[in-house]
C-alpha cells in the first residue's frame, strides 16, 4: 500500500497554495477576490476599505450619523432628527412656518402683505403711499392775483388726495398784499387763479398764478410723476375754440368770507377742469374762481382776505 505524501508544515491551504518559506509572491489576494473595496491591513489580513461616512469601528459596517440624523431602531432606516424652535413647527418630517397677519407667501417667498396706503419705496422699505399732492398746510406767499405783478401777493392752499379713481380736493385763499386785502372793500369781486400743468402733472410757473410746484406729502423725490393727480382728459376734454362749453368740466359750489364785524358773506366758487389748452407744453388745467356779489361791501377798511375751505372731487388721470 502506497504512502501519502506528507505536506510541509509551512504549507498554506489558501490560494496560491504555496509554502510561506518558498513563496515568491507573499500575501497576494486570491484570484476570486477583487481588490476593489478591499485592502490588506495588516499584510495578510483582508479588510474593507472605508471612507466617510462609512466606518467599521464597532466591528460591523455602519454609517457615521451626525447631529440631525438618526437610525430608526425598528426598521433600521435613516431618518432626520431635526429639532425646531418657535415660531417654526414640524410635522411628518416637514418644517413649517405659520403665517400671521401682515405676511403672505408670494412666488414661494415670504412677503409683507401691504394694505391701502402702503407701498415699497426705491430701497424696498415699507413706506406710506404718496397719495397726497399739496402746497403744504400753511404755505408762504406763492400765488399772484393782481395782473402784471411779479411777486406773489396771496397764499393758495391746495391739497389733492387720490382716492381710488377720483381725487378729493381742498382749496382756500389768503391775502398777502395790500391789493388783495382791500378787494372786499367792494361789493362785486372776482378772484381768478389759473393752474397749468405739464404732462407729468408739474406746475408751469411762468403761465400759472401759482408760482411754486406742488409737492408729495411723503418722501419727496426729484423726478416723481404727479400725472395720477390730474383731471382726466377723457372725462374732462379740452374745449376747442368756438366749440362752446362742456358743463361736465365745471364744478360749482359755495364758501364764505367772514368780515371783520363777524358777518358771513357767501362766495360762489367755480372750479374749471381743462378749460382751455394755451400752448403745447400744457397738458392739464385747473382754474378756481371766487365771486362776491353782495348788497354791501364786506369791509370798509383793509382786512386780511381769507376764504373758507372749499372741497371738490373729480375723476383723475391714470398713473
Swiss-Prot record:
GO biological process terms on file: adhesion receptor-mediated virion attachment to host cell; cell adhesion; symbiont entry into host cell
Induction or repression: Expressed in the late phase of the viral replicative cycle.
Q: A Pfam family matched by this chain, by name? A: Adeno_knob
Q: Does the keyword ATP-binding apply?
A: no
Where, subcellularly, is it found? Virion; Host nucleus
What are the UniProt keywords, alphabetically?
Answer: Capsid protein, Host nucleus, Host-virus interaction, Late protein, Repeat, Viral attachment to host adhesion receptor, Viral attachment to host cell, Virion, Virus entry into host cell
Q: Does the keyword Repeat apply?
A: yes
Return the InterPro entries for the record: Adeno_fibre (IPR000931), Adeno_fibre_knob (IPR000978), Adenobir_fibre_prot_rpt/shaft (IPR000939), Adenovirus_pIV-like_att (IPR008982), Attachment_protein_shaft_sf (IPR009013)
Q: Name one GO cellular component term.
A: host cell nucleus
Question: Which Gene3D superfamilies does this chain map to?
Answer: Adenovirus pIV-related, attachment domain (2.60.90.10), reovirus attachment protein sigma1, domain 1 (2.10.25.20)
User: Coiled-coil region(s) at which residues?
Assistant: none
* Repeat region (Shaft), residues: 44-73, 82-103
How this chain assembles, per its entry, is: Homotrimer. Interacts with host receptor CD46. Interacts (via N-terminal tail region) with pentons.
Q: What is known of its domains?
A: The tail region anchors the fiber to penton base capsomers, whereas the shaft, built from several repeated motifs, allows the knob to protrude from the virion.
Q: What does this protein do?
A: Forms spikes that protrude from each vertex of the icosahedral capsid. Interacts with host receptor CD46 to provide virion initial attachment to target cell. Fiber proteins are shed during virus entry, when virus is still at the cell surface. Heparan sulfate might also play a role in virus binding.
Q: Which family does it belong to?
A: Belongs to the adenoviridae fiber family.
Q: What else is known?
A: All late proteins expressed from the major late promoter are produced by alternative splicing and alternative polyadenylation of the same gene giving rise to non-overlapping ORFs. A leader sequence is present in the N-terminus of all these mRNAs and is recognized by the viral shutoff protein to provide expression although conventional translation via ribosome scanning from the cap has been shut off in the host cell.
Q: What is this protein called?
A: Fiber protein
- What organism is the protein native to? Human adenovirus B serotype 3
The upper taxonomy is:
Viruses, Varidnaviria, Bamfordvirae, Preplasmiviricota, Tectiliviricetes
